Structure formats: C-alpha cells, structure tokens
C-alpha cells in the first residue's frame, strides 16, 4: 500500500505574532495536489492537527477545507486521523461517526476501559485486507485508570500495555 503520511500540522499556529494561515493553506493545497497526482491508498494524519487544544474558528475552517478537498478526490482516498498531544481528543473526535461513513476515520478519544477497543479500519488493496488500529496520543497516567492502578514508567511502556 502507498500512503501519504502527515503529522504535526499545528494548524492555527502563529510564529512571533506572524499568522501562518496563508502558509498552512498553501502547504495543505500542495498535499491535495500530491494526493490527486499520486493516488495513494490512504492518507494518514498522525496527530497534532491543531496547535492548541481549543483551536480558533479559523484553524478549524482551514482543516475543514482541507478534508473537504481531499474527500472530493476521485478515486476516493481513505483518510485516517489520530489526535496528538496538542489536540483536544474530544474536539477532534467530533462528528467522527458520520465522517467515518464518508471515509474519514478519526480516533481522538482513547477507549475508556479494557472492554472497549481501539478504532479499527480495514482497507483493501490488490493483495487483500489490511487492518489499521488507530491509537491516539496517550499519557502514562491514562493507563493507570484503565489498568487498575498499573503505572508505566514511560510513554513507550504505556503504549505496550
């Protein structure tokens, strides 16, 4: 499978009072152009979509426009998105149910207990099915609440649990 992998978009970021809106819109437009040209099997956005956990309306609009342009491409390209440490898991997860029906799969929130599972997305190529388990950003303290007080020593140990 071929992917376009993006991370750390930090949409809405300002650099020393300089608004990066035009730069961000330009580079996201370039991504749309590359997706149109390369026709990947999926686009993976691995966290830090926004620069702040409560993004500005402008930042949300930029990301909305980006997803709208990507979702209009033919053939359709599935989009897999996970939240990062700068994102609000709940805000990023908003409308994920209906977006998933349109091929935009978002995992903002983590499972709240051991009975819940990570969001699984199954894609297919000429070799068969491929399963993706969307694991959003997690803090070691999260593991303690789900695994009855167990406390991992590091982020990597938390993910392994």
List each model region and its residues.
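His/Asp/Glu-rich metal-coordinating catalytic cores
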Residues: 87-161
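Metal-dependent catalytic neighborhoods of phosphoester/phosphodiester hydrolases
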Residues: 16, 49-67, 83-102, 106-108, ...
């Amino acid at each position: 499978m071929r992917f376009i992998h993006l991370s750390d978009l930090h949409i809405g970021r300002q650099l020393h009072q300089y608004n990066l809106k035009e730069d961000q819109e330009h580079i996201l437009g370039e991504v749309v152009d590359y997706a149109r040209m390369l026709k990947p099997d999926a686009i993976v956005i691995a966290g830090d979509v926004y620069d702040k956990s409560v993004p500005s309306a402008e930042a949300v609009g930029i990301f909305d426009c980006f997803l709208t342009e990507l979702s209009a491409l033919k053939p359709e390209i599935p989009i897999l998105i996970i939240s990062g440490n700068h994102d609000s898991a709940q805000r990023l997860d908003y409308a994920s149910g209906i977006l998933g029906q349109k091929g935009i799969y978002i995992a903002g929130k983590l499972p709240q207990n051991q009975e819940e599972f990570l969001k699984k997305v199954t894609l297919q190529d000429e070799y068969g099915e491929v399963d993706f388990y969307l694991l959003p950003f997690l803090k070691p303290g999260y593991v303690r609440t789900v695994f009855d007080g167990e406390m991992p020593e590091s982020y990597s140990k938390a993910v392994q649990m």
